[in-house]
Amino acid sequence: MSLPATFDLTPEDAQLLLAANTHLGARNVQVHQEPYVFNTRPDGVNVINVGKTWEKIVLAARIIAAIPNPEDVCAISSRTYGQRAVLKFSAHTGATPIAGRFTPGSFTNYITRSFKEPRLIIVTDPRSDFQAIKEASYVNIPVIALTDLDSPSEYVDVAIPCNNRGKHSIGLVWYLLAREVLRLRGALVDRTQPWAIMPDLYFYRNPEEVEQQAVEEASATGATEEATEEATEETTEATEWAEDNTENATW
């Protein structure tokens, strides 16, 4: 698929894709994923062509931007590493997020509270999100999926080849997809200027690490405050001592 020059993969985005290990695929390859294989390493790991990944990101973004109501797009991830990315993607593009367990019947059983009628769904992993893909096929909802080289492609209309097991790879693909959607909608006018949002915002963060970091920051803040108080007390004592000496000398 040839893209206009405006949509070409920039060296900066290519470096991001490589740094996030988006190009590291599975050892096994499905038949429909063979065109996305760039090379095979000596250890058996297949390398994904990041150029193909970028082309599919742009194609998916054009499909998403073509839907008038952003809420008709449903972003889904039952995989833990993709839940934060799905929530951020939905916050920036206006899509409807389903982060966590997908309730069976959400697309087919109108009696359930979680019933939805989206015009398009985006899933993080065709395996873990198979229930959503299966129900979408029943009601003719197009499916965009982040697929590894060994991922099943049944009922998937647009497959974005990438490493859908790594937290950095998943977050970066969702980030690039959100950025391209905003550019196509006109929210980001100039393509030469970088987006103010950083890719780190889409990465999964371990709650225990977040709590530990907060405790460390609080400890550092407390230590700084204690040092400031001690310095203030020492300064006050020195001032009082100097005043006492001055009074004694005057007397």
Curated annotation (Swiss-Prot):
The gene is RPS0B. Residues 214-251 are annotated as: Disordered. Residues 226-251 have a biased composition (Acidic residues). One of its GO terms (biological process) is translation. HAMAP family: Ribosomal_S2_euk. This is Small ribosomal subunit protein uS2B. Required for the assembly and/or stability of the 40S ribosomal subunit. Required for the processing of the 20S rRNA-precursor to mature 18S rRNA in a late step of the maturation of 40S ribosomal subunits. Belongs to the universal ribosomal protein uS2 family. Gene3D superfamilies: Glucose-6-phosphate isomerase like protein, domain 1. GO terms for cellular component: cytosolic small ribosomal subunit. Component of the small ribosomal subunit. Mature ribosomes consist of a small (40S) and a large (60S) subunit. The 40S subunit contains about 33 different proteins and 1 molecule of RNA (18S). The 60S subunit contains about 49 different proteins and 3 molecules of RNA (25S, 5.8S and 5S). Interacts with RPS21. The keyword Endoplasmic reticulum does not apply. It is found in: Cytoplasm. It holds the Pfam family Ribosomal_S2. Disulfide bonds: none annotated. One of its GO terms (molecular function) is structural constituent of ribosome. Residues 214-225 have a biased composition (Low complexity).
